[in-house]
């Protein structure tokens, strides 16, 4: 399953100039890294249903690797996958790839693609503000390869999370912080982060 997703992603990369991808801090996960990351999770053999969040899903490589891993666990029969992606260039590929995963998996896979800014769409919830959701959605598993870029300290994403932003913030650190917020108690999160800047 993952091989096909990687093949389609490589076609996208060849068609999209690096300058355009860099504008979004867009770097795609390799097949080996995606499988390694999905292999880090521990699954309760008694669980029949899991919820998964992939924020900044890109082409869906990490989601697909995670689904592929769940294929090996008989007890898990139902997967609820939420993917955030707001890059209009990659969204058609993400939709195509996740549709392919739905066709290939033997599990009941429910996919929700949120075409919104992952951070800004939840800042009211994160900051416990009026208008926010008092009980925001939490996930059993969070996986991610967030955008790699520094943002100005007055960028909307930085001002949306003042609790975690000091100085010149990195967007990937903000994504990881929101990922922890989205994680349910006893949940697990695996992210690719640059330790040099944290």
Where are these regions (language model features)?
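Conserved ATPase-coupling elements of RecA-like P-loop NTPase cores
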Residues: 152-156
